[in-house]
């Protein structure tokens, strides 16, 4: 994850959180110069824990797609209730573990 600034997460909408730049199409899939989103660290980590870079490039390469994904939507619903300073542990999903 790159530079961090404080602001509002584009995915969960929490404010006063540390933000990181998320490449909507991963850099290794050709997204170096494509659009990015500023996400809080827990949202950013959760996206990469749930999905491979290939999945992100093909199926979840926009904010609308990320917001409408059922698995990520459950996380967003939960994280919105958490205080900005809370540290979140993230684990890879079982589906992602199987793909390795």
From Swiss-Prot:
This protein's encoding gene: yisB
Name of the protein: Uncharacterized protein YisB
């Amino acid at each position: 994850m790159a530079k961090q600034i404080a602001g509002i997460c584009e995915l969960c909408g929490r404010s006063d959180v540390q933000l990181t730049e998320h490449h909507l199409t991963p850099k290794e899939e050709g997204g170096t110069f494509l659009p990015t989103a500023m996400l809080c660290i827990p949202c950013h980590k959760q996206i990469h824990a749930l999905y491979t870079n290939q999945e992100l490039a093909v199926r979840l390469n926009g904010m609308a797609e990320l917001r409408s994904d059922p698995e990520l939507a459950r996380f967003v619903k939960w994280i919105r209730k958490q205080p900005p300073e809370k540290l979140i542990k993230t684990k890879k999903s079982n589906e992602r573990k199987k793909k390795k």
